[in-house]
Swiss-Prot record:
Its main location: plastid. Signal peptide: none annotated. Keywords: Chloroplast, Plastid, Ribonucleoprotein, Ribosomal protein. The gene is rpl33. One of its GO terms (cellular component) is ribosome. The lineage of its organism: Eukaryota, Viridiplantae, Streptophyta, Embryophyta, Tracheophyta. Belongs to the bacterial ribosomal protein bL33 family. It is found in: Plastid, Chloroplast. This is Large ribosomal subunit protein bL33c. PROSITE patterns: RIBOSOMAL_L33. GO terms for biological process: translation. SUPFAM superfamilies: Zn-binding ribosomal proteins. GO terms for molecular function: structural constituent of ribosome. It comes from Chloranthus spicatus. It holds the Pfam family Ribosomal_L33. It comes from the Eukaryota.
Length: 66
């Protein structure tokens, strides 16, 4: 039997450099990834280096609230 309910949470990662620069004419949008994290192992907000197709480079993507 499962010990707890909803241990794995679905989170959305958003590009921090796109958000900081704002959506302007140069950038057509904001890069977002959907992933899961284990609440017991990572209680803090998740930050990963992912590729941003709008910045054309690897940037830090941080967890946002739903």
């Amino acid at each position: 039997m499962a010990k707890g309910k909803d241990v794995r949470a679905i989170v959305i990662l958003e590009c921090t450099s796109c958000v900081r620069n704002g959506v302007n004419k140069e950038s057509p949008g904001i890069s977002r990834y959907i992933t899961q994290r284990n609440r017991h192992n990572t209680p803090n907000r998740l930050e990963l280096r992912k590729f941003c197709p709008y910045c054309y480079k690897h940037t830090i993507h941080g967890e946002i609230k739903k």
